[in-house]
Amino acid sequence: MEKDTLLKIKNVSVVFDGFQALTDVNVTVKRNSIHFFIGPNGAGKTTLLDIICAKTKPTGGNVSFYPMHGEKVRLTGMKEYKIVKEGVVRKFQVPSVFVNLTVEENMELSLKGNKGVWQSIFHRTSEEEKALIDETLKKVGLEKRKDILASSLAHGEKQWLEIAMQFVQKPEIILLDEPAAGMGKPETFKTGELLKEIKKECTIIVVEHDMDFVKQIADCVTVLHEGKVLMEGDIHQVLADETVQAVYLGRGGERNA
């Protein structure tokens, strides 16, 4: 196994009530990279994220994780919370922050994810934890907003807060489902820039439809079509491929995985 391999998806297939959602999918994700899954509606992109984090069990195949420090971990068959503890976290498309808590309190809850909500609220945050929260909020441009309620944040800011809530846990992999959804061009660009900063410390796997966003930050792109890997490579190879153009890039306006 190459030293820069962090995640290996091997021969993964999924069948839902007779429908073949994924067929023999093989993907290798490199350490400290931003790896995109793209494809038209129903291609299997979000299902693949579900397989990685154990929300969905594959019909066949497996997913293996190669942490920086430690032995190979087989994620397939593990409980979702155990995968989080291994260092694989996920942010869904719709922000799920606690809107009645401040930005800082949301960060504290995420940092103490192994505790209950009320335990986390009343637990005294250490100076080291406060410093980590401040540093993380600065990375996403919310350091001056930490004392306001999350309900007061704009849509893009809520997305950045939730990304920060994942990153503060010091994961090795962050899974993102359409992080730029609902954003204007300036917010989308800023999201890309903060993800490029974050990838210095962890790997990011993204499901996305916005091709400008993909072009901005992708290190590797896996194109899915009808549950199979159509091709994989850098964004320039993907954009130049006539088959990809025919089945995906020529089908604009699609927003759902």
Question: Where in this protein do the model-derived segments appear?
Answer:
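A short, surface-exposed alpha-helical micro-motif characterized by mixed small hydrophobic
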Residues: V214-Q216
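Catalytic Walker B motif of ABC-type/P-loop ATPase nucleotide-binding domains
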Residues: I174-E178
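Helix-to-loop junction immediately C-terminal to a conserved catalytic motif
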Residues: C53
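The feature captures the beta-strand-to-loop junction immediately N-terminal to the Walker
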Residues: I38-P40
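ABC ATPase NBD Q-loop/coupling interface
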Residues: N62-K85
